[in-house]
A protein has these predicted regions:
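Cysteine/selenocysteine-centered motifs that mediate thiol-based redox chemistry or coordinate metal-sulfur cofactors
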Residues: 160, 167-170, 255-267
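Amphipathic alpha-helical effector-binding/dimerization core
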Residues: 73-174
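N-terminal helix-turn-helix
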Residues: 2-93, 97, 256, 260-264
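Short, solvent-exposed recognition segments
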Residues: 3-7, 136-210
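A structural signal for short hydrophobic beta-strand segments in well-ordered beta-sheet cores
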Residues: 68-70, 117-118, 219
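Extended hydrophobic
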Residues: 182-255
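Amphipathic alpha-helical regulatory segments at dimerization interfaces
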Residues: 30, 99-110, 116, 195, ...
Length: 267
């Protein structure tokens, strides 16, 4: 055995540090899904799979840094104001958002129903844009900034369907404990992914709001990895079997247009 003079404890520090950072980010992603209402500590423990003492230490360290806040009335934990201040340091608008801007606006005007742009972030989806159409009844189930586990929305299923099968199964397994809150399970999500691959798009017969339906198509980066999804949501009577193929083709064309626009400089 070679003695290089380095304390074994020192050699393990970088690995432990990276693990601590990943755990803290996992906690932050779960808290982000709670939005302004926040989440109880028990929910964060369940969703992350970490022990309660570990989550407690992480949360209170993040509170000290202003990254997390504890709500006085409810005792729940939520994302803190320091996160917004850090986000303001981003130097420019995302090329994806810029490319999708006109496409979403034109689609909302043409189709009359609500359009969403959703991106993948880790094992979650994040709604980054929403456009309201002219039809009197609009489906507004998801707000910009809403975060959900990959697989519980039609956008999430579309993104998973565009991934290699093994990678998609791994994410579904990781999110399994979180699915119950959305009245679904891993087997149901996997079945929807398989159906989306056969169709070339996702058709959700029952949307996040009762009496609604949604269609989603994936958007791929130049390296062919899915980066986002476009979703059209409407009341069920607006998405019947006759209109579905037409709308799906329109969304597929829109996705291809965005893919072409982001080809030089996606990030």
């Amino acid at each position: 055995m070679v003695d290089n003079g380095i304390d074994p404890a020192v050699r393990t520090e970088p690995r432990k540090g990276a693990q601590a950072i990943r755990r803290a980010l996992a906690v932050l992603r779960i808290l982000a899904a709670g939005r302004e209402e926040g989440l109880p500590l028990a929910e964060v423990v369940r969703a992350t799979g970490l022990t309660r003492p570990t989550v407690h230490r992480i949360v209170h360290a993040l509170i000290e840094e202003g990254i997390v806040e504890r709500q006085d009335k409810t005792g729940r934990y939520a994302i803190g104001g320091q996160v917004l201040e850090l986000a303001l340091a981003r130097p420019s608008r995302s090329p994806l958002l810029a490319a999708a801007d006109d496409v979403l606006r034109q689609l909302a005007q043409r189709l009359g129903d609500t359009l969403f742009l959703t991106v993948r972030t880790g094992n979650d989806t994040l709604c980054v844009d929403r456009r309201i159409g002219s039809y009197p009844i609009q489906v507004l189930a998801i707000e910009v900034g809403a975060r959900r586990p990959l697989g519980v929305s039609s956008a999430g299923v579309a993104i998973l369907a565009a991934m290699p099968a093994q990678e998609a199964r791994k994410i579904v397994a990781a999110n399994q404990a979180r699915f119950a809150a959305y009245r679904t399970d891993a087997s149901g999500v996997l079945a929807q992914i398989a159906a989306a691959r056969r169709r070339g798009y996702t058709m959700r017969e029952v949307g996040l709001v009762q009496g609604t339906k949604s269609i989603s198509t994936w958007i791929k980066r130049p390296d062919h990895r899915p980066v986002a999804a476009i979703t059209l949501s409407a009341v069920r009577t607006r998405l019947g079997p006759r209109r579905e193929p037409e709308l799906a083709e329109i969304l597929l064309d829109a996705a291809r247009e965005i893919e072409q626009a982001i080809r030089p400089a996606v990030r």
